[in-house]
A protein has these predicted regions:
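Active-site nucleotide/adenylate-binding loops and adjacent lid/helix of ATP-dependent enzymes
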Residues: 1-3, 57, 98-190
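ATP-dependent carboxylate activation and anion-phosphoryl transfer catalytic cores
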Residues: 2, 240-326
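Short, flexible, mixed-charge acidic loops at enzyme active sites
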Residues: 46-48, 79-83, 219-226, 282
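A glycine- and small-aliphatic-rich helix-loop capping segment at beta-alpha/alpha-beta transitions
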Residues: 79-88, 163-168, 299
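ATP-binding N-terminal substructure of ATP-dependent carboxylate-amine bond-forming enzymes
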Residues: 1-107, 111, 122-136, 313-326
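Phosphate-binding site of ATP-dependent enzymes
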Residues: 162-249, 270, 274-276
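Hydrophobic beta-strand scaffold residues
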Residues: 31, 87-88, 116, 145, ...
Length: 326
């Protein structure tokens, strides 16, 4: 089990890893911990770990990356695990990279005609040298808007701008995290999330769940996601039968079109019968309060059994893909 990592979501990863460790033990698996320090060193039993291509990782049957953000969820670690020739849970290199980049993912979904909120990708260089043009393009999205680093999750670095004066500082804040940002129009309705699991071509989809924020919370921020009592998950979501089927079908389509494998959580905005895709997370949170496991639990799959299934899916994919490796 890999946890920690170099990103700003290091602590979230450790919390997710603690939950996964317990669940794997309950499912009858022995978990071997590898913690990736903030500086990038891989540690096992307190000692720095070295790896050799083609030799696996500590004799593990399967690797479970419980890593969030850059250098973990973006295809980098997945590429290393491919070099080690070891089965691993979750999406491969390409799908991980595509889904981690919010702008690239949205452009892929737009090319497939998937309905989404309005958005604009902005680079730091363009913001610095073409500020007036960027401000005009952002204005088309209306207000309020949400400004996000392009490749972070867990609501890290997100700023809600409610007037024109707040747009510039919001972009400046995003660029303290990375050199690319995404600006998204606000969406009406409720936030609905759906968990997906299985092979790329034939995934299973959970019952959709509705995010209900604690009183006074303006939007689904980091505290709402990870602090006890920050939000309530209502399953099944209180949406129409038509919206429910649209959410589940779009979750399946987003998973398949982006080439995902193993698992994902897909997030939507639902207003009456209008369903808009928000984003897809290839390694969603696995803490006690995280939505991914709760949705499967409400769909009849207990947490330890879920982890066991994910490990089995990873092993099956590795066995299948070995046919094409020469």
């Amino acid at each position: 089990m890999l946890c920690g990592g170099r990103s700003s979501e290091h602590d979230v990863s450790l919390a997710s890893g603690a939950s996964v460790r317990v669940g794997l033990a309950q499912a009858g698996h022995e978990a071997i911990d590898v913690c990736i320090a903030r500086g990038g060193a891989w540690l096992h039993d307190g000692a720095e770990l070295s790896v050799t291509p083609g030799r696996g990782l500590l004799g593990a049957d399967v690797v479970f990356p419980v890593l969030h953000g850059p250098f973990g969820e973006d295809g980098t670690v997945q590429g290393l695990l491919e070099c080690l020739d070891v089965p691993y849970v979750g999406a491969g290199v390409l799908a991980s990279a595509v889904c981690m980049d919010k702008v690239v993912f949205k452009e892929l979904m737009a090319s497939a005609g998937v309905p989404q909120v309005g958005y604009l990708g902005v680079t730091e260089a363009r913001w610095r040298f073409e500020r007036d043009a960027v401000e005009r393009e952002v204005a088309v999205l209306g207000l309020p808007i949400f400004v996000k680093p392009a490749s972070l999750g867990s609501s890290v670095g997100i700023v809600k701008a409610e007037d024109d004066a707040a747009v510039g500082p919001a972009l400046d804040a995003a660029f303290t995290h990375e050199g690319r940002a995404i600006v998204e129009a606000a969406a009406a309705g409720m936030e609905v999330e759906c968990s997906v699991m299985g092979p790329t071509a034939a995934p299973e989809v959970s019952e959709p769940g509705e995010i209900v924020l604690r009183r006074g919370a303006g939007w689904y921020d980091f505290e709402a996601k990870y602090e006890p009592g920050g939000m309530e998950l209502v399953v099944p979501a209180r949406i129409s039968a038509g919206a429910r089927e649209a959410v589940r079908e779009l979750a399946r389509e987003a998973f398949t079109r982006s080439g995902c494998h193993g698992l994902a959580r897909v997030d939507f905005f639902v207003d009456a019968d209008e369903v808009l895709l928000n984003e897809l997370n290839t390694i969603p949170g696995f803490t006690e309060t995280s939505v991914f496991g709760k949705l499967w639990g409400a769909s009849g799959l207990p947490y330890p059994d879920l982890l066991d299934r994910l490990a089995s899916i990873a092993v099956a994919r590795h066995r299948e893909e070995r046919r094409y490796r020469h």
